[in-house]
């Protein structure tokens, strides 16, 4: 079968005093966002070429049909299809979700506390069937504070333009029928008379915040905030103490926030701190104080505290640390919980407010793991939370943990129906030197029977973009490779934030080559230390990681 050929049409382009020939710029459609909404608007010649590429790939993979089926069944066999989440107590109800073997979408359930009557308030498969659509993506599912309304957003075309609906949970009546072209995010007002949402512009950017009165037509919605810069996007959220709404506007490097009180009849957002190029900040309020998570004079962030936003008197709460990324806070009446990331490992810390004592939460002796935390209930007057962790060899485990007496109880463990023994696997964290001497973390997972003599095949995964960190958590799909003596290695290369903001900055823009070199030196380390050998390495990277793959195979094809 011949390799598909795309028509060439020469066009000379220039930028920054560099001129080049581009044979394929004709592919770009100016109305590409319209194509996302309606796939029939795709250039027919491009569609035909893509179909040829699909046929070409299928032709060359035809001998692997049985293997594909076997792998599919293996991976499916590790997924518990009939499953339920842990409950979350919100006012007078417990809410949770479940999945079933027969369905493709989740079901949201609730029951009144101290009763056994379970209500189904959302069923994705039934909703998709009612709409009779091919594509069905759920953006947000939010229940009102009074437990009366369910607001949800749907994308039925794969365009990531979401339409919002609001339904009366008891009567099933659609109260608000359609708010189109939104980002999908929904926030209820405290009195449950309104929702706040962001509208997408023609360039798919959220730059406007609207207030919608439940039951009204969307053309009556009130614009309460508009971002003038095309480079920034906006969002809105409720503070932890439920006394303020904060509107956040930001690009990747700079942010700004506005606030208004929840009881304002006509919301008038007030500026918190004027934007300053390169400065990120995020304000939250709790117990009559305001907390500012910011990188101002703190490359890897810090947390400051103030008694007022009108007369700001910021004082240190959590100091900055070199190459330690300081995360935000979760607030309870007696406790403040926060996170840190350093050397590609996450940590959780809990502070006793009355004693002003902080300590790390540790739930496993595994050297490489990913901790997580979630609240059991909306009421903050509690000492109990959910704390969990996973690792490259250990599926997720969640404990109900009492912060006061430090007792814990295992309440949910990710089940692998086909069976899984963590002791069959070995996880290593090693460091290697890159081209400029910087030390890069590398997480390696292998079966205990796999030999370290250069004979094993090895998949080296990399991303290194947008400040996204590759946390070393559990993945059941990887086991199909690892069980076949293929070593899985994740290089925590620059461009992510595994070692703080500087790690990101050293792998972006004019420093992007560091991302590529870090990956190449990871491959060299793995070969030099007999994890694999030349000709046995598999490179993997998707999305922005695709740029990485293109760069490294051209730079060092051997």
Positions of PLM-derived features:
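Cap/lid segment of the alpha/beta-hydrolase catalytic domain
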Residues: 126-141, 153-159, 173, 364, ...
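Beta-propeller folds
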Residues: 1-384, 388-396, 400-405, 421, ...
């Amino acid at each position: 079968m011949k390799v598909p050929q795309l028509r060439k049409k020469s066009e000379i382009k220039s930028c920054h005093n560099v001129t080049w020939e581009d044979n394929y710029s004709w592919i770009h459609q100016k109305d590409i966002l319209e194509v996302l909404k309606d796939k029939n608007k795709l250039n027919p010649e491009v569609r035909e070429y893509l179909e040829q590429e699909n046929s070409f790939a299928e032709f060359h993979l035809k001998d692997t049909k049985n293997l594909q089926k076997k792998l599919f069944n293996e991976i499916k066999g590790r997924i518990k299809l009939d499953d339920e989440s842990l409950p979350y107590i919100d006012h007078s109800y417990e809410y949770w979700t479940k999945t079933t073997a027969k369905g493709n979408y989740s079901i949201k359930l609730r029951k009144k506390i101290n009763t056994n009557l379970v209500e189904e308030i959302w069923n994705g498969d039934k909703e998709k069937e009612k709409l009779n659509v091919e594509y069905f993506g759920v953006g947000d599912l939010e229940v009102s504070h009074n437990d009366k309304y369910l607001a949800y957003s749907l994308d039925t075309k794969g365009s990531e333009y979401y339409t919002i609906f609001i339904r009366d949970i008891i009567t099933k009546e659609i109260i608000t029928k359609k708010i189109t072209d939104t980002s999908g995010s929904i926030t209820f007002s405290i009195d449950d008379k309104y929702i706040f949402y962001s509208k997408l512009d023609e360039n798919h950017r959220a730059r406007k915040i609207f207030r919608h009165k439940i039951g009204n037509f969307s053309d009556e919605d009130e614009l309460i905030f508009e971002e003038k810069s095309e480079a920034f996007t906006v969002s809105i959220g409720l503070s932890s103490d439920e006394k303020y709404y904060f509107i956040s506007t930001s690009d990747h490097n700079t942010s700004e926030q506005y606030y208004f009180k929840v009881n304002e009849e006509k919301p008038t957002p007030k500026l918190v701190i004027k934007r300053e190029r390169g400065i990120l900040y995020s304000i939250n309020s709790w117990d009559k104080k305001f907390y500012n998570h910011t990188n101002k004079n703190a490359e890897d962030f810090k947390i400051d505290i103030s008694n007022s936003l009108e007369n700001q008197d910021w004082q240190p709460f959590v100091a900055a640390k070199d190459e330690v990324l300081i995360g935000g806070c979760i607030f309870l009446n007696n406790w403040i919980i926060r996170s840190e990331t350093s050397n590609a490992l996450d940590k959780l810390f809990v502070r006793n407010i009355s004693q002003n004592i902080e300590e790390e939460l540790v739930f496993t002796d595994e050297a490489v793991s990913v901790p997580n935390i979630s609240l059991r209930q909306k009421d903050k007057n509690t000492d109990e939370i959910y704390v969990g962790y996973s690792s490259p060899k250990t599926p997720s485990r969640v404990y109900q943990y009492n912060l006061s007496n430090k007792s814990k109880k295992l309440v949910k463990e990710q089940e692998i129906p086909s069976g899984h023994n963590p002791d069959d696997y070995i996880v290593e964290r090693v460091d290697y030197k890159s081209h400029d001497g910087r030390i890069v973390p590398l997480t390696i997972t292998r079966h205990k029977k796999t030999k370290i003599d250069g004979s094993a095949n090895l998949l080296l995964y990399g991303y290194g973009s947008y400040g996204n960190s590759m946390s070393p958590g559990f993945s059941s799909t990887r086991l199909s490779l690892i069980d076949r003596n293929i070593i899985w290695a994740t290089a925590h290369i620059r461009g992510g934030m595994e070692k703080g903001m500087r790690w990101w900055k050293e792998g972006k823009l004019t420093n992007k080559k560091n991302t590529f070199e870090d990956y190449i030196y990871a491959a060299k380390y793995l070969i030099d230390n007999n994890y694999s050998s030349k000709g046995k390495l598999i490179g993997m990277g998707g999305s922005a990681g695709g740029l990485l793959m293109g760069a490294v195979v051209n730079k060092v094809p051997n």
